């Protein structure tokens, strides 16, 4: 059985703020990005059936499954927003950086604790695992399992020689199409115009995706949250940077 960071435990909730009760990011600082090709050490399942989702979601029902995946979830701001917007859905954040994923795990634990003290049951529908989604996504999800996937402010890998490391490429798009159900959506957001053009070009070239219309984008209740729910998005807003949004439907 695969163990998770929740199972391994951050029960002590150290380095938390006395005011908010939430973990403080200054104790979890790490480089902005991580090399996805490097041989990191991960504990990953051989197949989706081997994942013990109940270790991540205390209230999961027998017929329930993860439907939303935030790939490269960073410090978990958008993941928390998903949990609040869709209390009946299970959302998973996947993050490659160990300290950052530890922070998200501790953040969720603290939010659950605060909610419990108020006789609430919030945030038990979100979780985070440390993994390399570029390598192990099909190990976690069955064919057609996901309803929504999010790629928000991914590493742009500016150097041409590193473009192959970008999380949107033709080979990976086929893997995403495998775990995404027909009619499911892929949300992409970046502040780098070159990366945005790369994403749109590769998604348009793939036969299993179509870009939704600007009207559909504006009517999606998630769209406004994409701009500053995540920590990276909020930083772009503070710096008065540009946002480039593109949403695609699995066909």
UniProtKB/Swiss-Prot annotation:
It catalyses: guanosine(46) in tRNA + S-adenosyl-L-methionine = N(7)-methylguanosine(46) in tRNA + S-adenosyl-L-homocysteine. GO terms for cellular component: nucleus; tRNA methyltransferase complex. S-adenosyl-L-methionine binds at residues 72, 95-96, 132-133, 152, 230-232. It is an enzyme of class 2 (transferase). Its EC number is 2.1.1.33. Belongs to the class I-like SAM-binding methyltransferase superfamily. TrmB family. It is found in: Nucleus. Pathway: tRNA modification; N(7)-methylguanine-tRNA biosynthesis. The lineage of its organism: Eukaryota, Metazoa, Ecdysozoa, Arthropoda, Hexapoda. Catalyzes the formation of N(7)-methylguanine at position 46 (m7G46) in tRNA. Gene3D superfamilies: Vaccinia Virus protein VP39. The keyword Nucleotidyltransferase does not apply. GO terms for molecular function: tRNA (guanine(46)-N7)-methyltransferase activity; tRNA binding. This is tRNA (guanine-N(7)-)-methyltransferase. Keywords: Methyltransferase, Nucleus, RNA-binding, S-adenosyl-L-methionine, Transferase, tRNA processing, tRNA-binding.
